[in-house]
Each structure stands twice: as structure tokens, then as C-alpha cells.
UniProtKB/Swiss-Prot annotation:
Family membership: Belongs to the DNA mismatch repair MutL/HexB family.
SUPFAM superfamilies linked to this entry: ATPase domain of HSP90 chaperone/DNA topoisomerase II/histidine kinase, DNA mismatch repair protein MutL, Ribosomal protein S5 domain 2-like
Purpose of the protein: This protein is involved in the repair of mismatches in DNA. It is required for dam-dependent methyl-directed DNA mismatch repair. May act as a 'molecular matchmaker', a protein that promotes the formation of a stable complex between two or more DNA-binding proteins in an ATP-dependent manner without itself being part of a final effector complex.
Single GO cellular component term: mismatch repair complex
Protein name, UniProt field: DNA mismatch repair protein MutL
Phylogenetic placement of the source organism: Bacteria, Bacillati, Bacillota, Bacilli, Bacillales
HAMAP family given in the database record: DNA_mis_repair
Species in which this protein is naturally found: Listeria monocytogenes serotype 4b (strain CLIP80459)
GO molecular function, one term: ATP-dependent DNA damage sensor activity
Highest taxon of the lineage: Bacteria
Pfam families: DNA_mis_repair (PF01119), HATPase_c_3 (PF13589), MutL_C (PF08676)
Keywords tagged on the record: DNA damage, DNA repair
């Protein structure tokens, strides 16, 4: 009788593994570049043709592979990075599973030339995972891997690939993240001979941000850092005035590995809370160092997802760090920000031509087969003008306690109202220039901070009602409110059972608007019903935002000069006067110099 359960061949096993490890050309680039990083490379060249479908070449100046280990490197689960089970819980390298090379080789034509620099090198060629030839090669230290005809033996995989621009975008995104994670390595990336990314490898993260996102973004970035017993965080956060429509510009790096973690992204967004408009996201790069024992990278073959044993503590540290950083800064955007923001948004969509295949001028580092040249400085290594611009950017040093207290008192300067536009915007001036204030957003911020404080101490300030309020609900809502009573009490709503499907309310906070008590109670109860699992903190926050929005002066509301003066003076006392609770700007400024430049009084 024939056996029904059989052991799969190595070739078939490698193809199955390739399905998890090698999803698209970007996966090949990621795995090979990570190998180059683990090899201690200081310069890595990435040459791609036709978005990687035609050819991918990775060249490094790392440690290389010994001749006797070259063939072994293409066996499944063969690796030099871990030796035993204990090592699996203290992974210090980007790769460790021993799956990348055999998986890539099984679905492509692959040629590798490598040398440790101490003896002759080795060249090996594989097709579909089978070794075709192995011979002596050049002795220059480093490794060059060329992958061509990707997915030649798995045509079904080709059907699921996206357009060439999309696949190239995936490769670019991977390399951007790796460059941000390793500013001490020089990355050179070209497509069809056209350079797309170059970093100088001098260890300056801000220079890498400039190379990837542009100098204008780097100028708007401020250093962030925090430390606890378990974590050390550093990086750059871009000012809230510059933001994006998606989360792609949030980069979290743990021990040199770019990772995706929803909880950490949520913590970052919490740090920017009320500083960004709804639906907008920050630009931020965080490098996090921790003991490998508290991070599990062995979750998925792609190694993008990780498990953290102290995830909540790390999230709280990140949120607090971002809040404290921006609380020390004056966040009044200049009058040009709207124009810059639109230009930045246009630059998010980069169109890449696939017709032009003429190579740019050859440099000593982007070399052709079969020689691995020395990595000598070229003109492209020389400092760029952008580098000098970045050197002049202001640094943000930690302030003393006295300076912080003074800064908190004077977050925005004294302004003198000179008029109102469309009964919506207040125009004000001082010696620094012209200010335009959104009157609704300004009062919304003031009232939000008032309600946020009051909601936290509702039990101390209650007003007994002469005529209690009775509220009736459908049966399903009544049952759900029974479960939410404790939460509602935290925001000033005290429900007592009063007959079938009814509650009676005998008191409310004194800060409820007069003659609008029942309306406010209904609003808060609806908020709790719409999100049954809402936390007390979030319910308080949402209640404060809702009340501040409804009770603030609206657009098309004329104000007297005295009203405007009072509003601006009260705004100066707010802890975060620059945005409304929804993240919209409260105030923008045109400096005297900018105005004089507009009118050509200065050149």
C-alpha cells in the first residue's frame, strides 16, 4: 500500500518557504541588504532593473563568506547568526532563520561572488535552487549577489505582482526604512542606472531624513529622546504643521530593525493628540534600544512584526516624550505653511519613468562584474549643499526648570487686535509681525482645557436639581447603560434606576451650561452608547472635546475689540494654544520680514 504521508523534497520545501519570505522583488532586496548589514558593511550598493523583475544586484564591503561555507549558505536553516536555542531569545542580527538565500535561489537565477579578503574569493551560480557552478573568484573583501529572472519557475507568482511603479515604490520604501535604521551605513540605490537614494553613512540621522524626505522636512524636525530602565529612545519628530494623509511616514526601529507595531503607532499618535487635524498623521523616526530578551522577532518569516513584553510601558514613554518635546516649543506656523503643505503632498506621489535606461556616469562604487572594486571616495561622496544647510539648523537643547516654567507662561506673545475678517478671523499685531487667529478654534482650545480639567473632578462640584430629569431609553440601550453607569459617573452623569427603561438624574456638574443640562446629558450618554468599550480616559477626552466645540463662538460672529482682547489674553494662558482639540491650527504668523519681502521692501 502506497504511503500517503511523504517528506517533501528540499526543492519543494524551498519554494514553499519562498512563498513566505519572497513575496515580491522588495522582499529580495530586504533580505539581501539585511544580510549585508549583518556582515558589517559600511557601504551597500543596490542596483535594480525593471523594478527588480529583470535584475537585482546587491554589493557590499562586509566580511564576506569563507570558501567552505559558500555552498552551505544555500541550505535551508543554515546560518552563522545563532547557534542554540538560547541565542533565539537574544537575537542581535537582522537575519537569523537561514531561509533567505535558499528561498531566493529557489525562484531565480542567482550568482554570488564573495571573499573574506584574506584568500581567494568564491563565485557560485544557482538556477532554481540547484548549484550550477562553483569556482574561484576575486579576493576583494565583500559580497556581490546578482538575482535575475525572479519567479521564472513560479509564473503564478508573477500574476499577483503590481505595476512596475508600485513594485519599485515597495523597494524604495524598504530601503528608506533601512537607511533610517542605519545612518552609519552609506546606501546607494539606483534603478535602470538612475540614482534614487544616496546616504553618506556619517551616522547623522537628520542627514538621512533630508536625503529621503527633503531638506525642508529635515529643517522642521526636532530631536526627541527618552530613557527608562528598559528602553532608550532617540530620533526626530517633525513639527505638527507638516503632516501626511497616511501612516507611511511613521518609522519605528527597534535594535536596528524596522518594525510594524500598531500599539507603538497608536502611542505616537497619542503624543501628537490635538496637534494634528483629524485624518492627518505625523512624520517621525524613532530608534529604540532595548535588551533583546524583551523583544521576540521570531513571529513571522518576514521579521517585520515583533512581540514586546513591555509594550504598554514603551508606548507610554513614547507618548510622554513627544508631548513634552512639543510643549517646550512655540508651534505657530508661518503664513507659507499652507502652500508648503500642498507642495509636500504632491511630492508624496512620485512618478518614475521606465523608458529611460541610459546609465548615469559610472562611479567607482557601482561596479560591474566580475570585479569587486575598492570603495574609494567619489564626487558623490563629497558634502552636498544640503549638508551645509542642515548644519545651520537650530538645535533644541533641554531647558532648565526655570526656563521651562517661563516658556510655559509665554507660549505665545502678547498680541493686539486690529480687526476682524468675515466675522471669523481676528487680525492682531505686535513687534514681531501680523497674526491671524481663528476665533472658533481659539475659544475651542480654551474651553477644551477648562472642561478637561473640570471633568476630572466632577464629584467636588455638583449642582442639585430642583426638578430632577427623567430620561427614557429603548430596552437595548437601557441594558447597555446599566453596564456604563460607573464610567458615566466619572464624567458627571449620575444615573438612578427609575421605573421601566428609565433613569432619573438628580444632580449635575456646576459647569454644565445653564438651561442646557438635559442636552448635555443626552450628548454624553450618546457618546458612551456609541462606543461601549470606551475607556474612562477616552470618554472624558471626547466629552471635553464635544462640549468645547458646541459651546465656543462660531464663525460669522462679530466681536468687539474688547471681546477680541479678552479672547487673545485668555488664549495666552492655555497650555497648548497652537491647535484646537481637533488638531486644526489656531494661529498663524506673518513676520515683519516676510511682509516686507512680499512688498519688495527688502530683497
Amino acid at each position: 500500500m502506497a504511503k500517503h504521508i511523504v517528506e517533501l523534497t528540499d526543492a519543494l520545501s524551498n519554494k514553499i518557504a519562498a512563498g513566505e519570505v519572497v513575496e515580491r522583488p522588495a522582499s529580495v532586496v530586504k533580505e539581501l541588504v539585511e544580510n549585508a548589514i549583518d556582515a558589517g558593511s559600511t557601504v551597500i550598493d543596490i542596483l535594480v532593473e525593471e523594478a527588480g523583475l529583470n535584475k537585482i544586484t546587491i554589493i557590499d564591503n562586509g566580511s564576506g563568506i569563507e570558501e567552505e561555507d559558500v555552498a552551505t549558505a544555500f541550505l535551508r536553516h543554515a546560518t552563522s547568526k545563532i547557534k542554540n536555542e538560547a541565542d533565539l531569545f537574544r537575537v542581535h542580527t537582522l537575519g537569523f532563520r537561514g531561509e533567505a538565500l535558499p528561498s531566493i535561489a529557489s525562484v531565480s537565477h542567482l550568482e554570488m561572488e564573495t571573499s573574506t579578503g584574506e584568500a581567494k574569493g568564491t563565485t557560485i551560480s544557482l538556477e532554481g535552487g540547484k548549484i550550477i557552478e562553483q569556482k574561484s573568484g576575486h579576493a576583494r573583501k565583500g559580497t556581490q549577489i546578482e538575482v535575475s529572472q525572479l519567479f521564472f519557475n513560479t509564473p503564478a507568482r508573477l500574476k499577483y505582482l503590481k505595476s512596475l511603479p508600485t513594485e519599485l515604490g515597495n523597494i524604495t520604501d524598504i530601503l528608506n526604512r533601512l537607511a533610517l535604521a542605519h545612518p552609519d551605513i552609506s546606501f546607494r540605490f539606483s534603478h535602470n542606472g538612475k540614482p534614487l537614494l544616496q546616504t553618506n553613512g556619517n551616522g547623522d540621522l537628520r542627514q538621512v531624513i533630508a536625503a529621503i524626505y527633503g531638506v525642508s522636512i529635515a529643517k522642521k524636525s526636532v530631536p526627541v529622546k527618552a530613557e527608562s530602565l528598559d528602553f532608550k529612545i532617540s530620533g526626530y519628530a517633525v513639527l505638527p504643521e507638516v503632516n501626511r494623509s497616511n501612516r507611511n511616514y511613521i518609522s519605528t526601529i527597534i535594535n536596528g530593525r524596522f518594525i510594524k507595531n500598531f500599539a507603538l503607532v497608536k502611542a505616537i499618535q497619542e503624543g501628537y493628540h490635538t496637534l494634528l487635524p483629524i485624518g492627518r498623521f505625523p512624520i517621525i523616526v524613532l530608534q529604540i534600544e532595548m535588551d533583546p530578551i524583551i523583544v521576540d522577532v521570531n513571529v513571522h518569516p518576514a521579521k517585520l512584526e515583533v512581540r514586546l513584553s513591555k509594550e504598554k510601558e514603551l508606548g507610554q514613554l513614547i507618548s510622554q516624550m513627544i508631548k513634552e518635546t512639543f510643549h517646550k516649543l512655540q508651534l505657530i506656523p508661518d503664513g507659507e505653511i499652507s502652500k508648503k503643505q500642498k507642495e509636500d503632498q504632491k511630492s508624496e506621489q512620485i512618478q518614475i519613468s521606465f523608458e529611460e535606461k541610459k546609465p548615469v556616469k559610472e562611479t567607482p562604487t557601482l561596479f560591474s562584474k566580475p570585479t569587486i572594486p575598492e570603495y574609494v571616495p567619489s564626487d558623490e561622496d563629497a558634502p552636498r549643499e544640503d549638508d551645509f544647510i542642515l548644519e545651520t539648523m537650530p538645535s533644541y537643547e533641554p531647558e532648565s526648570q526655570a526656563e521651562q516654567e517661563e516658556h510655559t507662561k509665554e507660549r505665545i506673545p502678547k498680541m493686539y487686535p486690529i480687526g476682524q475678517m468675515h466675522a471669523t478671523y481676528i487680525f492682531a499685531q505686535n513687534e514681531n509681525g501680523l497674526y491671524i487667529i481663528d476665533q472658533h478654534a481659539a475659544q475651542e482650545r480654551i474651553k477644551y482645557e477648562f472642561y478637561r480639567e473640570k471633568i476630572g473632578e466632577v464629584s467636588r462640584e455638583l449642582q442639585e436639581l430642583l426638578v430632577p430629569i427623567v430620561l427614557e431609553f429603548p430596552a437595548d440601550e437601557y441594558v447597555r447603560l446599566e453596564e456604563q453607569k460607573a464610567k458615566l459617573e466619572e464624567v458627571g452623569v449620575f444615573l438612578e434606576n427609575f421605573g421601566q427603561n428609565s433613569f432619573i438624574i438628580r444632580a449635575h456638574p456646576t459647569w454644565f451650561p445653564k438651561d442646557q443640562e438635559e442636552e448635555m446629558l443626552r450628548e454624553i450618554i450618546d457618546e458612551a452608547l456609541s462606543a461601549p468599550s470606551i475607556s474612562i480616559h477616552k470618554l472624558r477626552e471626547d466629552t471635553a472635546i464635544m462640549m468645547s466645540c458646541k459651546k465656543s463662538i462660531k464663525a460669522n460672529h462679530y466681536l468687539t475689540t474688547q471681546d477680541m482682547e479678552a479672547l487673545l489674553d485668555t488664549l495666552r494662558e492655555a497650555s497648548d494654544p497652537f491647535t484646537c482639540p481637533h488638531g486644526r491650527p489656531v494661529i498663524i504668523q506673518y513676520s515683519t520680514y516676510e511682509l516686507e519681502k512680499m512688498f519688495k521692501r527688502v530683497m
